[in-house]
Design a protein with these regions (language model features):
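SF2 helicase motor core recognition
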Residues: 91-92, 149-151, 321-325, 349-352, ...
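Inter-lobe coupling linker of SF2 helicases/translocases
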Residues: 83-89, 97-104, 123-137, 141, ...
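Conserved Helicase C-terminal RecA-like lobe
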Residues: 1-4, 8-26, 98, 223-375, ...
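Conserved helicase motor
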Residues: 56-66, 86-91, 119-122, 315-319, ...
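Conserved helix-turn-beta segment of the N-terminal RecA-like "Helicase ATP-binding" lobe
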Residues: 33-61, 161-165, 331
């Protein structure tokens, strides 16, 4: 994470392409990650290669015509990069067929970013990647933490690289027998099952892995900037899409019928759209109803890579503070998070003290309106914006909570942004150091209600 993995791959692709050894680069990554490769490719590819390469981006929203057009491109000449989200390989036959065609058309380097996505050997996407691997001339896996939950997670990841690495083990069970300590327990219905209770011979396993990997630690990257920014793209669920479209049409109709539209009128409707994106709606009677969303899953995926470290999570809505806290407590156990928002005025100072002093209290969940000023939470090197406030001051001030005079570590800021929604506009305005109330004029509301 933040150590230059993407640039390393793009540089290697450029070198191998120049030698005539590789013509295609297939990058498979989680849905929230794979689109960032497009930005990085445009930034890091050499000018000469950038002029010749065709950059192909899988999009689950594409219709049949767009997909057929995409499918025809691998047969054309020249270097190409195909960016695919791993989730599509679980369920979409066309996505699998496209990757297979891409690999077959020319010598290919296949890369799996955040390679823990193939740690489960039973998953369809893992089976596809393992089947595709022998047909790729080069294979690479990238991960900030290849074993987030168990050393056993490494088995299928390295099998993708080369089955000869763990050739002595005929399957995962044999691998587990070598490196795991197991015991039998009796379940509530009387069944006897075997569970992993610990691990053994990890020095041996590490020595094997070291022969086939290159590791860079963040602390060794001495030239990192004080702040680094990344975006995780999140797709709306079907229910969110339906609600969002209905609310967008309602907003446009309502604003279109007004004789004079103010920025405040527009902001009111944008706030309702943002609530849907966050995963809930609020009726006129102030009753909040949850709707399925993918942001929480994406947040947990980021935190999974942040083992044992502290993080600050910003959420605009009080409802989301409660929801995030409940999810984290369920995932990491009671006492893992502190809160700082309008709903805990009497206890939030105590919560802050726990976050600062208790190693087990890893997460601070706060609203920018309550915790954005005057707080020092510099024990965190990760900041996640679950949602953004429309107020630039809220953003600027909240970013500084993880900073402190004399701090020697870089802070990573993640924005969870739902594609094709108001969130893209909001983040754009904040990066231009503008509050939405200043950026919006009444007569340009149509470009904001998107």
């Amino acid at each position: 994470m933040r150590t230059g993995k993407t640039k390393t791959i793009l540089d290697e692709f450029g070198e191998l392409e120049a030698k005539g050894e590789i013509q295609h680069l297939l990058v498979v990554a989680p849905a929230g990650v794979y689109r960032t490769w497009k930005v990085d490719a445009e930034k890091h590819l050499s000018d000469e290669l950038a002029k010749r390469v065709k950059l192909l981006l899988w999009d689950s929203k594409d219709g049949p015509a767009a997909r057929e057009k995409l499918a025809s491109i691998p047969q054309q000449g020249g270097p190409k990069i195909l960016l695919m989200n791993i989730e599509a390989l679980s369920t979409v036959e066309f996505a699998q067929a496209l990757c297979a065609r891409f690999i077959k058309a020319a010598p290919t380097m296949m890369v799996i970013d955040e390679s823990t996505v193939i740690k489960s050997g039973k998953a369809n996407r893992t089976k596809f990647c393992l089947a595709a691997a022998p047909h790729c001339k080069r294979r690479r896996i990238l991960s900030g933490l290849p074993t987030p939950q168990s050393p056993l997670d490494i088995y299928t990841q390295f099998n993708f690289l080369d089955k000869r690495i763990f050739a002595e083990f005929k399957d995962l069970k044999a691998f587990q027998d070598r490196y795991a300590i197991t015991r039998q327990i009796k379940t509530g219905n009387g069944r006897i099952i075997e569970i992993v209770s610990g691990f053994q011979r990890l020095d041996e396993l590490q020595a094997t892995i070291a022969k086939h990997s290159y590791r860079v630690l963040l602390k060794d990257c001495t030239d990192l900037p004080e702040k680094q920014y990344m975006v995780r793209h999140v797709e709306l669920t079907p229910k969110q899409k339906q609600n969002y479209l209905e609310m967008k049409e309602y907003a446009r109709t309502k604003l279109g019928n007004q004789e004079y539209v103010t920025s405040q009128n527009v902001l009111t409707h944008l706030l309702r759209l943002q609530q849907i994106v966050a995963g809930h709606t609020t009726s006129d009677g102030d009753v909040t109803v949850d709707i399925p969303e993918n942001k929480t899953t994406e947040m947990l995926a980021i935190l999974e890579q942040w083992v044992g470290k502290k993080a600050v999570i910003w959420a605009t809505f009080d409802h989301d503070v409660k929801k995030i806290a409940a999810v984290l407590e369920k995932t990491y156990g009671p006492g893992c998070c502190a809160r700082f928002w309008g709903g805990n005025r009497n206890t939030r100072e105590a919560d802050e003290a726990r976050f600062k002093n208790d190693p087990k209290c890893r997460f601070m969940i706060a609203t920018p309106a309550s915790g954005g000023r005057g707080r020092t939470w510099d024990s965190a090197d990760l900041v996640i914006y679950y949602t953004n406030s429309f107020n630039y001051e809220h953003r600027a001030q909240s970013e500084e909570r993880a900073q402190a005079v004399g701090k020697k570590t870089s802070v990573l800021y993640y924005d969870l942004v739902c594609l094709d929604t108001v969130e893209e506009k909001v983040l754009g305005a904040l990066r231009n150091k503008m509050s939405l109330s200043d950026a919006i004029t009444g007569d340009d509301y149509k470009k904001w209600v998107v």
